[in-house]
């Protein structure tokens, strides 16, 4: 019986890992469709390379930092319980690799390639798993203190804070240290529009992410006996709420329309196992509003050139999601209970503080040591030709 359960659980979490692996194609196409044509190849290569670096670093360092588990044992030992511990690593790796994928969208079109891979190694090896261990493995006694003080631990079922807010708040200092793209803002304060280069690819990326997100959220149960359809229903409602509010506030702009469902899904991750579907709908709708309002404000008023809006989308909507779990997760508002708003507030603030400080240190050190921005000539030429020596489409065909 145990063998059947182990096999079923291993398959369950493996399918989740594969769905989230596919989400990285979504990250790539969302960025490809948003950046200008001369930076499309770079978007594709960067996401793939970041995932490969994340895999190696998380295998040797990050997973041990978060969970105290290493894989330096014989294959026979590793294969026990149908290899469940191995596919659990694969599943959690796909979460860790989302950190550089999120950052990539913010620093697009002007960041150096190799320094970003170095940043990925440090962030996935140390910064991300440090907070992951606190939130999901009880490190430093923070969860025990919150439970003793406020009656419940910090609850983040699928990573509104641990993954999305951390990624978004690491990206913010990276974007600020890089500075705006060449020609984005004039000395007089005027804003030069850089519209998406390919709306169909942007939409494709958003759809891939949206579909994969149901693996991201539902499979966070990690075993079949803990799986609950409430998570899927709440994810669906948050997606719908985020879409409609972003569509309305964005005045039918397709960029806002297709980021709306992502905003809702980011926010519902933390409390998707606790909320009533109506609470999830409200959480997603508010997230859609946060994204549209803050994206416009950061770009036009504060002159922060966050290309894909990853700080509003992941950083702020993720922060809202951590807090929303402590609101709509309460039994008084139709939730399942077992959550404290104060624990959610303190846990969320701790997560974004660790992320922001870690981001400043990592990108600040790289900027001082080797530089993190392309030369003006390279930026003007585009990252595709400057870094990869090829464009996304041939300028001309050669016939013999």
Annotate each PLM feature.
Residues 1-400:
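Hydrophobic alpha-helical transmembrane bundles of multi-pass membrane proteins
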